[in-house]
């Protein structure tokens, strides 16, 4: 069961948070999670995207994002990227007004405005935790359905 949302692809309505996920994130990061599933309704949902879906360049409202890549043998370039604006070098929302690097709605999908800072390859069952306030996007989408496309579980949270 998936729903319409602000992202691309299909996303589950239900949150799937397995035992000790929050505690494991806290242990890995050495921080206490202060806002989790109760605050962020998309924490713990599954999502997939397929070839032809545009990449969306964005920052999150949440402090941290995490994703677990769930497609076996996926192309490595189909992971997630932290990017910087080519014109002004901004790669994090703390460096200026987000409207300076997203001046018009159509620039959210215009990859020519950005260059890669960090690339997290799509490795099956790998969890990547990153600063949600950094400008980021998916790598390449691939496949034609949930069985052959880019599948991941995502988490959003704040911590101190």
Question: What are the language-model segments listed below?
Answer:
Residues 1-55, 79, 86:
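Non-heme Fe(II)/2-oxoglutarate
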Residues 49-160:
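Catalytic core of non-heme Fe(II) oxygenases with the double-stranded beta-helix
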């Amino acid at each position: 069961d998936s729903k319409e949302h602000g992202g691309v692809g299909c996303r589950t309505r239900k949150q799937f948070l397995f035992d000790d996920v929050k505690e494991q994130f806290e242990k890995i990061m050495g921080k206490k999670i202060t806002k989790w599933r109760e605050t962020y309704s998309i924490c713990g949902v599954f999502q997939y995207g397929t070839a032809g879906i545009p990449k969306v360049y964005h920052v999150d409202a949440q402090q941290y994002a995490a994703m677990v890549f769930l497609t076996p043998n996926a192309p490595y370039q189909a992971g997630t990227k932290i990017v910087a604006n080519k014109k002004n070098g901004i790669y994090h929302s703390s460096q200026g007004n987000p409207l300076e690097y997203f001046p018009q709605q159509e620039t959210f999908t215009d990859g020519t405005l950005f260059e890669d800072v960090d690339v997290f390859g799509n490795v099956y069952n790998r969890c990547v935790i990153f600063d949600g306030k950094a400008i980021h996007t998916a790598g390449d989408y691939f496949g034609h359905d949930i069985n052959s496309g880019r599948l991941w579980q995502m988490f959003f949270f704040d911590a101190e």
